[in-house]
Amino acid sequence: MIKNKRNLFFCSIFYLFSVDSDAEKNLESLMSVLYSQTSGEIKATFVQTYNTATELLDKAINDEDWDAVLESEGKRNRTPAIILDVDETVLDNTPFNARSIMNQTSYPEGWDIWIYEEKATLIPGVKDFLLSAQKRGVKIFYVTNRRTVYEEATKNNIKKLGLPFDDDVDVLLTRGENGWGSSKASRRSYVSENHRVIMMFGDNLNDFFDLPDKADYVSRKESVLEYENMWGNKWFMLAN
């Protein structure tokens, strides 16, 4: 917390004395980071999301028809599992965003350095939820579009934070691994072959289903409504 406040302080000072022509853009970025790091409301939504999911665990585990993956073939007698995106769903990278503002850089510049530092912190509520799921025999899978080259550092970061991580099974599925592209559909299918995915978590619609290339805001809204029965019981969107 102290480190985050220090980041915010220096970000604010940097902006006040900046003469960059992109000052308006810098201000937007600064306000976004300030909100993410200081807002009680956004933290409450994270905790609320994971608390709601915790309350549904037993129901989801015991219902053989409870399946969160659209690509699933509906096989019976599979081990229950949960799929989570990593960035801004499990790991909080707002210190990286603050650093980018201070350095006048933008993603992906510096992203690899940040990952290798293994210093991302937890999204509020996620640890208690995952530990509760693990105690119930649920397998935890992390499906991320971080590239395969970052897999070891990402695994280390997750394990340092005390989150469930199975070393006997590949539970961290990265972009580029096994020929997987940026679409997560193939990785969802991979997990669902032997596991009944009872819940999925993410901060982007593509964490739950594939959208058409260059989908506009209208089609995105329509897609959300098409699957409205999934949100809040099988699918959980986190604010970003």
Q: Where in this protein do the model-derived segments appear?
A:
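Asp-based phosphoryl-transfer active-site loop
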Residues: I82-N93
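Hydrophobic h-region of N-terminal signal peptides that target proteins for export
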Residues: S12-D20
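Substrate-recognition element of Asp-dependent hydrolases with the DxDx(T/V) motif
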Residues: E88, V126-I158, D203-L205
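Second-shell loop/turn segments in exported
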Residues: Y35-A44, D112-K119, F141-R147, G176-E177
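Non-catalytic pre-domain segments flanking phosphatase-related domains
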Residues: V19-L84
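Metal-dependent phosphoesterase signature
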Residues: L91, N97-L122
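C-terminal cap/substrate-recognition subdomain and adjoining C-terminal extension
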Residues: N51, R147, E151-N240
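Sec-dependent signal peptide recognition
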Residues: N4-C11
